[in-house]
Amino acid sequence: MQPPDITRVFKGPQNEFEVEIVFAREGNQSPKEGHTYDEIIVVTDGVIELERSDREEISTHSKYDTIFLPQATVHQITVKKAPVKLVIIHPERQEQQD
């Protein structure tokens, strides 16, 4: 599967805050990963499936759904109905970035 397009609109580790905008098409899938910080995902268009390590079932999310992922929660997003647009917020990101 191809990864989605990700744009960091505010890259601020010095401020411990980051916002990403994700544009995904049919067939896109995120890497299976966890983070050292909490993550908030807002679905603004499309339908996604979310697999996460803190739940047994795979959940489906669509327009205007908001998802909270605590730090260290391994997760993977799969596009189910494109186009998908996501706003991803890292309110306390403290690690160094490129």
Language-model-detected regions and their locations in the chain:
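Ligand-binding loop in jelly-roll beta-barrel domains
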Residues: Q71-Q96
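N-terminal non-globular leader segments, chiefly Sec-dependent signal peptides
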Residues: M1-Q14
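Structural signal for conserved beta-strand scaffold positions within catalytic alpha/beta enzyme cores
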Residues: R8, I21-F23, I88
